[in-house]
Design a protein with these regions (language model features):
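Feature captures the catalytic ectodomains and active-site-proximal regions of enzymes
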Residues: 1-183
Length: 183
């Protein structure tokens, strides 16, 4: 019953918002430029925070995360991983290299380290496939430069994966294609 009341209130609010946004200056300007309307609020991921068992307590593994983006940092902390950061730089290769170097320094203290970059996702959202290719190539160069460090210990498993597909063209933001995984 409470969920139904919440859904009804949210639906009412979203309808009001839709109509209010139709008349705003930004919307009128977007229409004049032939751009898609901005006429809704994103309500995904809404909910209450609840207790989550820590990753170390569930698996016995001590982990760290070196991620770009506050959401990944918060998620790491939520599940009991140590969140580390590097000084952000605009150069994709240098940024990823700094993350990998920090991972190398941290390896003796952790069972696994999650290194994340949003760079390919951000490039894909620009809908410029050349930009996405350049970002992936920059990440490859950074990874190649760090392979001696990552391959010196046979017990180290390096996994490269994508969290989701982001088309470089068309209207979709994310899509459902399979993503590559390299081990």
């Amino acid at each position: 019953v409470r969920a139904e009341a919440t859904a009804k209130a949210l639906r009412t609010y979203l309808r009001r918002t839709f109509h209010a946004l139709e008349c705003c200056e930004v919307q009128i300007s977007r229409r004049q430029r032939g751009l898609a309307p901005v006429n809704a609020l994103v309500t995904q991921r809404a909910g209450r925070m609840r207790a989550v068992p820590s990753f170390p307590s569930r698996t016995g593994l001590k982990g760290a995360s070196i991620a770009s983006g506050a959401m990944f940092r918060g998620l790491a902390e939520l599940v009991g991983l140590d969140a580390h950061d590097v000084q952000k730089v605009r150069d994709v290769q240098a940024d990823f290299a700094a993350r990998l170097s920090l991972a190398g320094e941290l390896l003796p203290r952790y069972d696994f380290i999650h290194v994340h970059t949003k760079a390919p996702d951000q490039a894909a959202h620009s809908k410029d496939c050349r930009a996405k290719r350049e970002v992936i190539e920059a990440l490859d160069r950074a990874l190649e430069a760090h392979m001696p460090m990552l391959s010196q210990d046979p017990s180290i498993l390096t996994v490269v994966a994508s969290d989701h597909s982001t088309p470089s063209s068309g209207p979709m933001i994310h899509s459902g294609e399979p993503v590559p995984v390299i081990m």
